[in-house]
A protein has these predicted regions:
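Bacterial carbohydrate/catabolite-sensing allosteric modules
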Residues: 1-145
């Protein structure tokens, strides 16, 4: 998924800007972006040797992050006391889980409008170039991180 790769790249950039050396063991590739994959990824990260497990996890989607929270709980970790968790998308469930999920919100309506406008432009002129568009996101701070 291109968007997952872009979010991963942003995570790497943020670590670099914060002066944190990224460890390959912190990046867990999953085959799908669902709850179970998040829980399994959290369990795998918590099996790293003492001192190597992360104290914060950024998931590329809120659905994965919800699984991460529960996977951490299953590993005996408390969110956010032991491990902070941040998701991406600000789905409705993010505010309803325990603890409520810190997340990055996308402007969903504007995203849909922009996609439709670009698609109509492409239909009108199949040879027209379609620009890359980056819409502003915002951090929604809740209790998980």
């Amino acid at each position: 998924y291109l968007y997952a790769q872009q979010r991963r790249d942003g995570w790497r950039d943020a670590l670099g800007e914060a002066g944190i050396a990224m460890r390959d063991a912190w990046r867990v590739n999953v085959n799908c972006l669902d709850y179970d994959a998040g829980a399994q990824a959290a369990a795998a990260l918590m099996q790293l040797p003492a001192g190597e497990a992360p104290d914060a996890i950024f998931a590329v989607s809120d659905t994965l992050a919800v699984g991460v929270v529960n996977g951490l709980r299953g590993a005996g970790r408390r969110v956010p006391h032991d491990v902070a968790v941040v998701g991406f998308d600000d789905i409705a469930l993010a505010a309803q889980i325990d603890p409520p999920l810190t997340t990055i919100a996308q402007p969903m309506r504007e995203l849909g409008e922009t996609a439709a406008r670009l698609l109509l432009r492409r239909f009108a002129d199949p040879r027209a170039s379609v620009p890359g568009v980056l819409l502003p996101h915002r951090l929604v701070v809740r209790e998980s991180g």
